[in-house]
Amino acid sequence: MTATLPTTPTADARIAELRGQIDQCDAEIIALVHRRLAVSQEIGELRRATGGTRLSLAREKQVLARFSAALGGDGAALGMLLLRQGRGRL
């Protein structure tokens, strides 16, 4: 077990400030995910309306490769979650 050092008012204030920045990042990420879902749903509707398949495996591979290259293994998992959100489970 590791001992924790007592924090100081200065450290507490900085931590609160940094957490505020994280909260702002989270809000931006959530907004972007909503935007991505709307775009993905429109693509799916257009593909189905024109007789296409619901999804494109080649495109999904591109997305996963991009997330993996940028963020590693966890990035691929994040990419898969976003794809699933947009198209539903297979």
Where are these regions (language model features)?
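Domain-level signature for soluble enzymes in the chorismate/prephenate branch of the shikimate pathway
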Residues: 1-90
